[in-house]
Amino acid sequence: MKNLSIFLFVVGLCMISDVYGKKSTITVKNELNPKNKNILKVHCKSKNNDIGVKYLKIGEVMSFSFKTNFWGTTEFWCNLYKGPDYKRYRGITAYQAIGLFAKDGSSYNWLARDDGIYFHKDSLPSYYKTYWL
């Protein structure tokens, strides 16, 4: 009986992890001034996943999707570097789950522009979030 209870508990956890929450998406777009021909260097990662370094030309987009973990502690950070010399940069928290029962399925959109970094969630209007260092 004890083994059956443990087995059912483990199967239940596996089922929850498969259906729990929806996939969220992080998108980063290079909207820098085309006259300057700046390439945007992007490096996103979490505690457990390194998405890798991407180089985005003007107008290009990178995106990736993920599920928030069961504990609601999922967090992704992105470092954005403004070309051509990549001396101007900014680190952002691109996504942060809030709470034990965090489940989302939203799209987190980051836009790199000459005057700073802009953000919008899903189809809401974008707004100025932070400046380049």
Curated annotation (Swiss-Prot):
Keyword Secreted: yes
GO cellular component: extracellular region
Compartments reported by the entry: Secreted
Major place of residence: secreted
Mitochondrion listed as a keyword: no
Pfam families: Self-incomp_S1
Region forming the signal peptide: 1-21
Record keywords: Secreted, Self-incompatibility, Signal
Name listed for the protein in its UniProt record: S-protein homolog 21
Organism expressing this protein natively: Arabidopsis thaliana (Mouse-ear cress)
Gene: SPH21
